From Swiss-Prot:
Propiece residues: 117-121
Site (described: Cleavage): 116-117
Source organism, top-level taxon: Eukaryota
Lipidated residue numbers (Phosphatidylethanolamine amidated glycine): 116
SUPFAM superfamilies: Ubiquitin-like
Name of the protein described by the UniProt record: Autophagy-related protein 8
Keyword hit for Protein transport: yes
Function as written in the Swiss-Prot or TrEMBL entry: Ubiquitin-like modifier involved in autophagosome formation. With ATG4, mediates the delivery of the autophagosomes to the vacuole via the microtubule cytoskeleton. Required for selective autophagic degradation of the nucleus (nucleophagy) as well as for mitophagy which contributes to regulate mitochondrial quantity and quality by eliminating the mitochondria to a basal level to fulfill cellular energy requirements and preventing excess ROS production. Participates also in membrane fusion events that take place in the early secretory pathway.
One Pfam family this sequence matches: ATG8
Entry GO CC: autophagosome membrane; cytoplasmic vesicle
Disulfide bond sites: none
Length: 121
């Protein structure tokens, strides 16, 4: 899936920003969170997040739910490289496994399980 953030910002600028963030906030992970293109779920108000490295995927999903004001009965799925990461996984381990060459971790979200793949821990 194409990232709008990548389309809007050149690689060198993204890489420099991620490096600056990692130097200044060593215990935080730079995350870009974008909606899956054809999903009918609400669009998030901001794409860039500085996530504590000890946050779990489940806790991050909670943050996203709050940002898009998603009601409790509605489902949300987040994907890293088109795969659903384990809810209990730490964001730091997801970052180490899936960070982009520019230094950001790219996460997409959707109201439906559009890809259908689960990552097993």
């Amino acid at each position: 899936m194409r990232s709008k953030f990548k389309d809007e910002h050149p690689f060198e600028k993204r890489k420099a920003e991620a490096e600056r963030i990692r130097q200044k906030y060593a215990d935080r992970i730079p995350v870009i969170c974008e909606k899956v293109e054809k999903s009918d779920i609400a669009t998030i108000d901001k794409k860039k997040y500085l996530v504590p490295s000890d946050l779990t995927v489940g806790q991050f999903v909670y943050v996203i739910r709050k940002r898009i004001k998603l009601s409790p009965e509605k489902a949300i799925f987040i994907f890293v490289d088109e795969v659903l990461p384990p809810t209990a996984a730490l964001m730091s381990s997801i970052y180490e496994e899936h960070k982009d060459e520019d230094g950001f971790l790219y996460i997409t979200y959707s109201g439906e399980n559009t890809f259908g793949n689960f990552e097993t821990a």
